[in-house]
A protein has these predicted regions:
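Short helix-initiation/N-cap motifs at beta->coil->alpha
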Residues: 74-85, 98-100, 177-196, 237
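Bacterial signal peptide processing site
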Residues: 22-25
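Extracytoplasmic "Venus flytrap"
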Residues: 32-57, 280
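A ligand-binding cleft/hinge motif common to bilobed small-molecule-binding domains
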Residues: 96-109, 170-171, 197-200, 204-224
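A conserved helix-loop-strand patch within extracytoplasmic ligand-binding domains
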Residues: 118-173
């Protein structure tokens, strides 16, 4: 439910004092009434390095503030679910979501609109990985042997770290994950944690975003000889930037189109690096209909 913003008595009293002095400060419009501060608040799912979210995504906020000539504030989220809850409560009006959390946001807020995705998000993949000690190697065939291993997902709300891997387990084995695995799977909470925990042997196998795995290998944080990619899924749509309909009330009719175009036009290296994307492209809610259908079959919460 969208929460209304109510001025406090203290704020009204202060506004009255300022009017008496003939000022127009603190958001007054000259009529003696305090005006609401116009801010676009933006958040993102904590898919990796959850302690450095603000530092990571501030360049996106800076780019949008400059491109749209408005104030933009990044608001960290402690979990996937928290990012959707903030959006539902209108505490944020723009979210960098995964496919699952994006669908959740669109479902819970009538009029919410998916604006953009990275080019690679239209053909995203998950990697199944295993500790080298298991003896499993890369194959085009689904790794059915992981049924006997200690396995971890990322977050239970992660598209590439849980929902789609579970979908492909079901598609290839005819069994739900709880039936397929001999031991109940774990949840690391984030893609990078999945890779690290498989590499150090905390878990024997896991599933994560292909992009995170490749980035960790390129940075030397993961040794592909120790955390071995054993299978990659078929492609699916994933990450997206979804906007709250109230932005049109705050910034005027047509603002969502302007926001979408600003994101598509983005060539700011720091902003694109924050999103781990080279280019953003237009999408709409229908782009994620396939994810919505999978979510009806695969449920963990």
């Amino acid at each position: 439910m969208i929460k209304a913003v109510v001025s406090s008595l203290i704020g009204i009293g202060l506004a009255g004092l300022l009017v008496g002095c003939g000022g127009k400060e603190n958001g007054e419009d000259g009529s003696g009434k305090a005006t609401a501060k116009k801010v676009l608040r933006f958040s993102a799912i904590p898919d990796e390095d959850t302690t450095a979210q603000k530092e990571r995504f501030q360049p996106v906020a800076d780019y949008l503030a400059k491109a749209l000539d408005i104030e933009v504030e990044f608001v960290p989220s402690i979990s996937y679910g928290a990012s959707v809850e903030k959006f539902e409560n209108n505490d944020i009006q723009l979210g960098w979501f995964g496919g699952v959390t994006g669908v959740q946001a669109m479902t819970r807020v009538e009029g919410a609109r998916a604006l953009v995705a990275g080019e690679k998000d239209l053909a995203f993949k998950s990697y199944f990985v295993a500790n080298a000690s298991t003896g499993l190697e890369a194959s085009d065939d689904f790794p059915a042997a992981i049924a006997d291993l200690k396995f971890t997902y990322g977050s239970s709300s992660s598209t590439s770290g849980c929902i789609m891997p579970s979908h492909f387990i079901m598609e290839n084995t005819g069994k739900a994950p709880r039936e397929f695995f001999k031991e109940t799977p774990g949840f690391s909470g984030a893609h990078d944690k999945t890779a690290m925990q498989v590499q150090d042997g905390t878990f024997q196998a896991g599933a994560l975003s292909f992009g995170t795995y490749e980035k960790l290998v390129a940075a030397g944080k993961i040794d592909p000889e120790k955390c071995v990619k054993i299978w990659e899924t078929p492609p699916y749509a994933d990450y997206n930037m979804t906007a709250h309909p109230d932005l049109e009330k705050t910034f005027g009719e047509g603002f969502l189109d302007k926001l979408q175009q600003a994101l598509v036009d983005c060539q700011d290296e720091a902003a694109l690096k924050a999103l781990s994307r080279e280019k953003l492209v237009k999408v709409d809610n229908e782009t994620f209909a396939g994810i919505a259908a999978v979510m009806e079959k695969v449920k963990f919460d």
